């Protein structure tokens, strides 16, 4: 673990390292007297790091992925629920990097329906059949998904070192969009290597 700070000249310093390895031992921010409950949503980080190696992301290649236990997440959600928060934005870089854990998380989220809605970032190329079935059975309105497509050009994704085949991602996106019980948005990223401006507009209209 490193130390991040501003020096006397207000320049950012981190000694080249600022990483929390014992992520599950951090104090819950919701228990702090300084936590800001004035917003209509709360951001919740249940994992830190990412299995993927996307060159455009600061978390790309940050392994191992560190996780909180389901019980620890439940305790935090209980606090959030007691404060009347109805929207939780899960900050995990790839919610379904581990499909078994993703299914356990979805079962946990069910416990808070209809009081809390969850916003997740999901990699559509990694959807297993089991996770698809789980998503299809969730209560109406429990989830709002952001599906990371990033580009409709395979060479752009390969150059950006993003794992997952485009064909699989599009198949997963098609499935997610067919589900009537949740809202799904697809993400594209402008400015990726080899991604020309006209191609971005073509992808938007596809």
Region roles according to the model:
Residues 1-17:
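Glycine-rich beta-alpha loop elements in corrinoid/cobalamin-binding modules
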Residues 2, 11, 22, 40-42, ...:
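A generic secondary-structure signal marking the coil-to-beta-strand transition
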Residues 17-33:
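A short, charged helix-loop
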Residues 28-180, 190:
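Radical SAM [4Fe-4S] cluster-binding motif and immediate context
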Residues 34, 205-206:
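A general structural signal for short secondary-structure junctions and capping/turn motifs
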Residues 131-135, 193-205:
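Catalytic cores of alpha/beta
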Residues 185-186:
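C-terminal EAL-domain catalytic cores of bacterial cyclic di-GMP phosphodiesterases
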